[in-house]
Structure formats: structure tokens, C-alpha cells
């Protein structure tokens, strides 16, 4: 026999060594696991072969299975379990184990993990990375786990069939990874703190059973993705904040159980759902479903109470007029605000935004303008044969203008301006006043003969060839218009000449000391009482300031193409030459002075520190101000104008008479205030949430405040709040998760990731909002050096308090008088504060969900009526006649818009209507 070669001996020796080492590693891991159990199973002894221990299976001396379910085990799971490289199945469910679930990363053979119903308090970061063979992950009912996020590393576990993570304290949004999990059939995530929308990738999955019900803060968005989930058998989405209609589920031929109760769903129950043969159980109660009461098959178990159906008899249709209006709402995605008002089977019985004839039978006006609606214009509007006026302006509508509208014989006015419509411009009869400008940049220019497409006026008749009489009328109208335009221009030139003469005669001011101020007319709303700059007078204030009879000549402004030029002395006069007595506050960006005009209107004038402005150029500064002056939100302090004088820059804001939230929380006794009631505190918190929500997600772009704190939350006479100090606002670029920036903000309110890396996302503001909530609850400052170290940092201390709910009453502001009902509200706010201050940004909710949590608490008290807030700005590129025309147009139409105080569940309800031409962005300020 030939002797083995040295190479063969080396390979054999290496193999034996590796096998021996692997077995030894398994022995070490199993002994560590035995020590971590208290006590271990009785036969788990170091003196016996671990492969013979109860619940352990081996193959070739390597551990492949650990099965210890229902053994009443205590202790924890040793991290050495991650070295069992041949492990295929772990079953340790229904025990009393605690500690952290260790990492199983890179155990490529692992197929099953069962750890349900234990007392684990955490999950190792990346615990499930690299588990390419994993089929089942079940951690249900471990609700002591510290808040964590859905493990996105599961994207590599393409063999997964089942994920059970219900009641495990998951927070944040779901990653959009489910199209990568082609084998996934069961996804159970109920009873967590998941927020955000259903990921679109669910539509490309093969999921059969989807349980995502009972999220603490509630998921939101539509459920449209269900229409693509053709493998669905069971879908539990109840107890969330989903909105919009039920999609077409006719392709889900195996769907037998659909739970949609307790959401904000709207619209008509689709007929395809009524005929779905597989359906056996459905819950629709406690939503806002509209239209006919659906008639399901007798075999289907249905709960459907507490909706807004037009009839009480199943299968009975609504009146034609109601069905038409619901079709119109359908084009807009069935907005919740319409569902709340459009109830019953008579559209003339108090439906909002609908006006009827004197007989109370036919709709003659439909006013859906200035609500930020999305969607398209439904051609069903043409079925409203008596309709005279249709307002759809100031929304975000897309698509085309239906040609059916041109055949409405009663129609006299249609306004679709300030939308994003496209396609051809329909040719309306000459009797119809048709407005489509400004906005609608993609809308065609082939309008009728009666108006220029550039003006968006009334269009002429089709073709414009109705006879010689029509042509003569057109010529006459054209001549009259030309004469009026000429006279307006002539008057403007004369006016400008006279004003320049007066300016030269009475204001011997060095041209270098003349500033420019851009003024916007901010109508005071319920949030600012009489403290707003406009003081409730609207355009009258503008006229008073510019009238020669308004007082001293130093108050006479020169209008030049929309800009208003004033001497620096005007601001000196209204602030008593920037007297120390007029100082309202100081900040890193300047000093704020109280100012009072001759008519008694109060303003706040911020004199910017030169050092704070840095090297910012004049053109950049003006570009920023041009944006800030054109937008409004009822919970953001309004910037009214600015003045530039050489290197000095001044900002003019509305005045907020009740100071800031910090004064009412921490200095109320010294300042002679009464302590805030719980009602006032929750209302203020909701106002702030709505303002910041608008910055983050409801404006055209996303903006980050970066310095949210009580001193930047200002209060009006009715104690409604507005967010101020936008000197630090950062634009969040589209498509980027975060922005690297120079550190700004205030210690105590800085999110951990921002303080550590300087990378900022909207979750930085969410963290600061959580700190403010804690201050509202406790009456304590975010940082208080007068307290012992363990209590000086509010977030750290309060999060310890939250571990035991019974400790919360002891931590509250002693001025609060809380009954049982109030305490329930306090617990909700305390819980929200904890979520907002989670250490990991992805575990924090967005501000929209803060609004949804706080809204129902405020709704109980019905706080001060939120009046309509119209906002008007003068664009720097707009001529005076154009500005005056805008004011006239707004004055004739705005009074009928935006009635009522809408439900907290509609984030759009926190957006006041804007003047036409204003972008959907944000307004900011640092004054009072």
C-alpha cells in the first residue's frame, strides 16, 4: 500500500482540527447557555454530553435544534448562542426569560426562531442580519422590549414565510422591503407603535395574512395598496388612522376576513366588495363611509354602525343630487372634511360648501376652493343641472377640465385658478366667467374669444363666430378695456410723480439711509387676537400707512412696483428710537423691540445683529424674505415685512401680546400670570404640533426648525400658540434622509444624533417637541442646574418616570388640578412625549401623528373658534395695479371660503387658506 502524501495528510489533519474546534465551540456555547438559565433544565450538566440534554438535537456532534418551550425558564439567553453555526431551530417561547435578545447574525443555517411570550427588554442591533435561510421569526408578546424599529436587515432573509412581531413595542415607520420577501405569507405586527403609511412594496408581495391593527399612535395614509395584494386572505387594519376610500379588492379572490373598523375611511363601499364570493367577515364600523348603506350577502358577518350613510335601509340608493356630489368628492379622494359634513340624503339641508336655490331643492353653488384638495375634477359635476357657481380654486388638482362642464346651461362662474391642471382649455359660452389664472402652468392656451389666456378671464363662445352683433360687442368691450388700462397707467404715473415730489419736500433723508420694506397684509386670526400686525383691519391698515392724512410725513411710503420704500426713521419712530424700554427680548440673531403705529397697531421689530448675519449677501437675504412674506399658517408667527439700511437689516413681525410659553410655565408667578390650565396646555401643544407638521410635510417643501423650545412658542390673547424664531430653519432637500449642517439650537432640546453628528432630519424637531411636552407636563425646564445631577436633565429623568405609570402623577406640575378624566389625557400626552424623545430617530413618530394624538384631547373642550385666516402679500415683481386687482378679487371671494373648525384627524384642517399665487411653503419669525 502506497504511503499517503504529505498534502493529503495536511488536508486530513486540517479537517479533523476544524471539526474538533467546531464541536468544542458548540460545547462552550451550550455551557454558557446553561449558566444563563436560572435554573437550567435538570439534565443540563457539564458532566454529560450536551447532545444528550433535553430539548437539544445534534447532527454529527453539532447542535441543530434547541427546543425549550413552556419550561418556566428564567434568566437570559447567553450571547454565545450566536456561535452555534449549524443551528437550524430555536424554540424558547412561553417562558420568563428577560435580558436582551442576542444577535443571531450570520447563522446562515438558522430557519426558525420562536421566542414568543417572554419578558425580554431589548433586541440586539442587527440581531437578524445575514439569516439567509430564515423561514419563521416569532417574537410576539414581548411588550417589555425597549422601543425598537422593524428589523430592516430581514431584507436578506428571502426565504421568510412568517413574521410575528405583534405586541413587541416596535415604533416608527415600516421599511419598504416586502417586495424582496417573495415567500412571505404571514405578517403580524399588531399592538405596536408603528406610524406612517403602508409600504408600497406590500403590493408586490405574496402576503396572505396581514395583521397590522391597534397601533398606539395609529398608521395613516390610504389603503390603496391592498388592491395589488391579490393573495390576501385576511387583513386586519382596524384601530388606526387610515383615510380615503376602500380600493377595488375584486382581484383578492381568497379574501375572507377584512377588518377596517375604527379608522377614518371615507367614500362609498365599492360594489365589487359586495359581490366578493370569498368574503365571510367584515367590520366597517366607526369610520366615515358615505353613500348607500351596503347590502352584503346573508352569509357575510357584518358590523357597520357609526358611519355617515345617506340611508338607513341596506341597498337603498341615495338621491341623484347626493350621488353626484359624492362622485365629485370621489374625484378628490373623498376628503374627510367633506364626509363629516355631507351627511344624510338632502344636500340642501346644511351641507358645508353647498348653497341651494330659494326652494331648497337644487344646488346652485359649490364652493370647494382653498382647501388644498388633491385629485381631479369629476365630470359628474355636469349632472348638477342648476349649478351657477363652481369654485375649485386654491387646491392641488391635476388632470384636465372635463368638457362636460361646457354644456351646463345654468353655469355662470367657474374658478379653477391656482391648481396644477393641464390639457386643453374648454370653450365655455360667453355667459360663463371662467378663471384659470394664476397657476395651471401646463394648461393649454387655446381659450375662447372672450378673454386672453394670459388673464384667465371669461372665455368667449365656441369659435367666436356667432354673428356681426357679437363681433361689435367684442370690439366695444375691447376699446373700453384699453381705455381703462390706459387711465390706470396714467393715474399710477401721476401718483408716483406726486409722491416723489412729497418725499423730496418733506423727507430730507440721505438715500443711503432709505430702506425697503415688503409688507404683507396678515389678517389676525384666533391665534393672535388683537396682537397681530394687521389688528383685524386687513387692507385698511395698508391704506392708513400710505395715506397722506395718516400723520407724520415720515410714515408716508413710496410704492415702487410692489415694493414699499420707507426712511429708516419710520422704524426709529415706532420703536422710540429703539429704546431700551421697548425691548421685548434678545437672542443670538438680534434684539426684538415693541413698535406701535399711529393707528395703535402693535408690531415687533427685530434689529438683526451684523455678526449674526455673517456674509449673507443682500440678494440672498431678499430671496429668503420674498418667500417668507408670501405664506401663512395660523400657528406660525407672521413675518410682515423687512427694512434694509446699509449693512443693517430689520424684520417686522406680528405682535403676540401674551409673551412666550416659557414665561407661563417657569416665570408665571414673577410676571403676575395665572398658571396654565391643562386645557390651555394641551391646546398649546396641539397648535405647536400643527405648525411644525406644516413645516415638515404640508408645505411644498420640507423645512426643519432646529430650535423648537418654549421661548419660541408665542401666545395670543386667547392663549393660542404660534411657533416663532425661524432664523435657524433649514430646507430639507428632496430625496435626502438628512442634512449635514453647522450645529444650531439649544442644549436640552438637541436630539442625540444631531448633537453627535450635526446631521439633521425632521425627527430633530420631533425630539424637541417631546421635550416641550415634558416641560408642559412637569413645569420644569429641559436643563436645571439647581437640581441634583440625576434630575437635572428632564428627558433622562422623565423617561425613567414613564417606566412605571403610577409615578407620573408625582412628576406633574403642582399647579395642575387633575381629575380622573384629565389624568387619562395626561397619560396620553406623557406617552407621546416618551415616543417623541426616543433615542433613535426612526423610532420617533412624525408630527402628523402628534396632531392625531393631541387632537381628540382638545376636541373635548372645543377651544376657541379658529377663524378664517386669509393672507395677502405683495410680490416684489408685481405692479401696483396687479396688487390692487388681487386684493379686490380676494375681497369678493374669500368671505365664502373655509367655514368651520374641522376635525383634528384632518391634517389639512391646520392649514389656513392662502391668497392666490402664494406658494405652499412656510412663514417664519422671531418676534412677538
From Swiss-Prot:
Cytoplasmic-facing ranges: 494-928
PROSITE patterns attached to this UniProt entry: PROTEIN_KINASE_ATP (PS00107), PROTEIN_KINASE_DOM (PS50011), PROTEIN_KINASE_ST (PS00108)
Domain Protein kinase, chain residue ranges per copy: 578-858
Keyword Magnesium in annotation: no
Primary location group: membrane
Residues carrying a glycan: 144, 193, 281, 383
One Pfam family it belongs to: LRRNT_2
Catalytic activity: L-seryl-[protein] + ATP = O-phospho-L-seryl-[protein] + ADP + H(+); L-threonyl-[protein] + ATP = O-phospho-L-threonyl-[protein] + ADP + H(+)
Subcellular compartments: Membrane
Coiled coil: none
Active site as annotated: 707
Topology Extracellular: residue spans: 25-472
Example of a GO cellular component annotation carried by this entry: plasma membrane
Catalytic EC class: transferase
Inducing factors: Initially up-regulated by exogenous auxin or brassinosteroid but down-regulated after a prolonged treatment. Down-regulated by abscisic acid, gibberellic acid or cytokinin.
Keyword Cell cycle: no
E.C. code: 2.7.11.1
Cysteines engaged in disulfide bonds, as pairs: 51-58, 310-318, 348-356
Residues the entry annotates as binding ATP: 584-592, 606
Membrane topology, from the record: Single-pass membrane protein
Tissues in which the protein is found: Expressed in roots, leaves, stems, siliques and flowers. Ubiquitous, with a high expression in mature pollen grains and in the pericycle and the xylem vasculature of the primary and lateral roots.
Subunit relationships: Interacts with BAK1 (via kinase domain), SERK4 and SERK5.
Stated role: Involved in auxin signal transduction and cell expansion and proliferation regulation. May be involved in brassinosteroid-mediated plant growth and development via auxin regulation. May be involved in microspore and pollen development.
Free-text comment about domains: The leucine-rich repeat (LRR) domain is disrupted by a non-LRR region, resulting in the formation of two LRR solenoid structures shaped like the Arabic number '7'. This is strikingly different from the horseshoe structures of the canonical LRR proteins.
UniProt protein name: Receptor-like kinase TMK4
Source species taxonomy: Eukaryota, Viridiplantae, Streptophyta, Embryophyta, Tracheophyta
Name of the gene this protein is made from: TMK4
Amino acid at each position: 500500500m502506497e504511503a499517503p502524501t504529505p498534502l493529503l495528510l495536511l488536508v486530513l489533519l486540517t479537517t479533523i482540527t476544524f471539526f474538533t474546534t467546531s464541536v468544542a465551540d458548540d460545547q462552550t456555547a451550550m455551557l454558557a447557555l446553561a449558566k444563563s438559565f436560572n435554573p437550567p433544565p435538570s439534565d443540563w450538566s457539564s458532566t454529560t454530553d450536551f447532545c444528550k440534554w433535553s430539548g437539544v438535537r445534534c447532527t454529527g456532534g453539532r447542535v441543530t435544534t434547541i427546543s425549550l418551550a413552556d419550561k418556566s425558564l428564567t434568566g437570559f439567553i447567553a450571547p454565545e448562542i450566536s456561535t452555534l453555526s449549524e443551528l437550524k431551530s430555536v424554540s424558547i417561547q412561553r417562558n420568563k426569560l428577560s435580558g436582551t435578545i442576542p444577535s443571531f447574525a450570520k447563522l446562515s443555517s438558522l430557519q426558525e426562531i420562536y421566542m414568543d411570550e417572554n419578558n425580554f427588554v431589548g433586541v440586539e442591533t442587527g440581531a437578524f442580519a445575514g439569516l439567509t435561510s430564515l423561514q419563521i421569526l416569532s417574537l410576539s408578546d414581548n411588550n417589555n422590549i425597549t422601543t425598537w424599529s422593524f428589523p430592516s436587515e430581514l431584507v436578506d432573509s428571502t426565504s421568510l414565510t412568517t413574521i410575528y412581531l405583534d405586541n413587541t413595542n416596535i415604533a416608527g415607520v415600516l421599511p419598504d422591503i416586502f417586495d424582496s420577501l417573495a415567500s412571505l405569507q404571514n405578517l403580524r405586527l399588531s399592538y405596536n407603535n408603528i406610524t406612517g403609511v403602508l409600504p408600497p412594496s406590500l403590493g408586490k408581495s405574496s402576503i396572505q395574512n396581514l395583521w397590522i391593527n391597534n397601533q398606539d399612535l395609529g398608521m395613516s395614509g390610504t389603503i390603496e395598496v391592498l388592491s395589488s395584494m391579490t393573495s390576501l386572505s385576511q387583513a386586519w387594519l382596524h384601530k388606526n388612522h387610515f383615510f380615503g376610500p376602500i380600493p377595488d379588492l375584486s382581484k383578492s379572490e381568497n379574501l375572507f376576513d377584512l377588518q377596517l373598523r375604527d379608522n377614518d375611511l371615507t367614500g362609498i363601499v365599492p360594489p365589487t366588495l359586495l359581490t366578493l364570493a370569498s368574503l365571510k367577515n367584515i367590520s366597517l364600523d366607526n369610520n366615515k363611509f358615505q353613500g348607500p348603506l351596503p347590502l352584503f350577502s346573508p352569509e357575510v358577518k357584518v358590523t357597520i354602525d357609526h358611519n355617515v350613510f345617506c340611508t338607513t335601509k341596506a341597498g337603498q340608493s341615495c338621491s341623484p343630487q347626493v350621488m353626484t356630489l359624492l362622485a365629485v368628492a370621489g374625484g378628490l379622494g373623498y376628503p374627510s372634511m367633506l364626509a363629516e359634513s355631507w351627511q344624510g340624503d338632502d344636500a340642501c339641508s346644511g351641507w358645508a360648501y353647498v348653497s341651494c336655490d330659494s326652494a331648497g331643492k337644487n344646488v346652485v353653488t359649490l364652493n370647494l376652493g382653498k382647501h388644498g384638495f388633491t385629485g381631479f375634477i369629476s365630470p359628474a359635476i355636469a349632472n348638477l343641472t342648476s349649478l351657477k357657481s363652481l369654485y375649485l380654486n386654491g387646491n392641488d388638482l391635476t388632470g384636465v377640465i372635463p368638457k362636460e362642464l361646457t354644456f351646463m346651461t345654468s353655469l355662470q362662474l367657474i374658478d379653477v385658478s391656482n391648481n396644477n391642471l393641464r390639457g386643453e382649455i374648454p370653450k365655455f359660452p360667453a355667459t360663463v366667467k371662467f378663471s384659470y389664472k394664476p397657476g395651471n402652468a401646463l394648461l393649454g392656451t387655446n381659450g375662447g374669444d372672450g378673454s386672453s389666456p394670459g388673464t384667465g378671464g371669461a372665455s368667449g363662445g365656441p369659435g367666436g363666430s356667432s354673428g356681426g352683433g357679437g363681433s361689435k360687442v367684442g370690439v366695444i368691450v375691447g376699446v373700453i378695456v384699453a381705455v381703462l388700462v390706459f387711465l390706470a397707467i396714467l393715474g399710477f404715473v401721476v401718483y408716483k410723480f406726486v409722491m416723489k415730489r412729497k418725499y423730496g419736500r418733506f423727507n430730507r433723508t440721505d438715500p443711503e439711509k432709505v430702506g425697503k420694506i415688503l409688507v404683507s397684509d396678515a389678517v389676525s386670526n384666533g391665534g393672535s387676537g388683537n396682537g397681530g400686525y394687521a389688528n383685524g383691519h386687513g387692507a385698511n391698515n395698508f391704506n392708513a400707512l400710505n395715506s397722506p392724512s395718516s400723520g407724520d410725513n415720515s410714515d408716508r411710503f413710496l410704492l415702487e412696483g410692489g415694493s414699499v420704500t420707507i426712511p429708516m426713521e419710520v422704524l426709529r419712530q415706532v420703536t422710540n428710537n429703539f429704546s431700551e424700554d421697548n425691548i421685548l427680548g434678545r437672542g443670538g440673531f438680534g434684539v426684538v423691540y415693541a413698535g406701535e403705529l399711529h393707528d395703535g397697531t402693535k408690531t415687533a421689530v427685530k434689529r438683526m445683529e451684523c455678526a449674526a448675519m455673517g456674509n449673507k449677501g443682500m440678494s440672498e437675504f431678499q430671496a429668503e424674505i420674498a418667500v417668507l412674506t408670501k405664506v401663512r399658517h395660523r400657528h406660525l408667527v407672521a413675518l410682515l415685512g423687512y427694512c434694509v439700511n446699509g449693512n443693517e437689516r430689520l424684520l417686522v413681525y406680528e405682535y403676540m401680546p401674551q409673551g412666550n410659553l416659557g414665561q407661563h410655565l417657569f416665570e408665571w408667578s414673577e410676571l403676575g400670570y395665572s398658571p396654565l390650565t391643562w386645557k390651555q396646555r394641551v391646546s398649546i401643544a396641539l397648535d405647536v404640533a400643527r405648525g411644525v407638521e406644516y413645516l415638515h410635510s404640508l408645505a411644498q417643501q420640507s423645512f426643519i426648525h432646529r430650535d423648537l423650545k418654549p421661548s419660541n412658542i408665542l401666545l395670543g390673547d386667547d392663549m393660542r400658540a404660534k411657533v416663532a424664531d425661524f432664523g435657524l430653519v433649514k430646507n430639507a432637500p428632496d430625496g435626502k434622509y438628512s442634512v449635514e449642517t453647522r450645529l444650531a439650537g439649544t442644549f436640552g432640546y438637541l436630539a442625540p444624533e444631531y448633537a453627535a453628528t450635526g446631521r439633521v432630519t425632521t425627527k430633530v424637531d420631533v425630539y424637541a417637541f417631546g421635550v416641550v411636552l415634558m416641560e408642559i407636563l412637569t413645569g420644569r425646564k429641559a436643563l436645571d442646574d439647581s437640581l441634583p445631577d440625576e434630575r437635572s436633565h428632564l428627558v433622562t429623568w422623565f423617561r425613567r418616570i414613564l417606566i412605571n405609570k403610577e409615578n407620573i402623577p408625582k412628576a406633574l406640575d403642582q399647579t395642575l388640578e387633575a381629575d380622573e378624566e384629565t389624568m387619562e389625557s395626561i397619560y396620553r400626552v406623557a406617552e407621546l412625549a416618551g415616543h417623541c424623545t426616543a433615542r433613535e430617530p426612526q423610532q420617533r413618530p412624525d408630527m402628523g401623528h402628534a396632531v392625531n394624538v393631541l387632537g381628540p384631547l382638545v376636541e373635548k373642550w372645543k377651544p376657541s373658534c379658529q377663524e378664517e385666516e386669509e393672507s395677502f402679500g405683495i410680490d416684489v415683481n408685481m405692479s401696483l395695479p396687479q396688487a390692487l386687482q388681487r386684493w379686490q378679487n380676494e375681497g369678493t371671494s374669500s368671505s365664502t371660503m373655509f367655514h368651520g373648525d374641522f376635525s383634528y384627524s384632518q391634517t389639512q384642517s391646520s392649514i389656513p387658506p392662502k391668497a392666490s399665487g402664494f406658494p405652499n411653503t412656510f412663514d417664519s419669525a422671531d418676534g412677538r
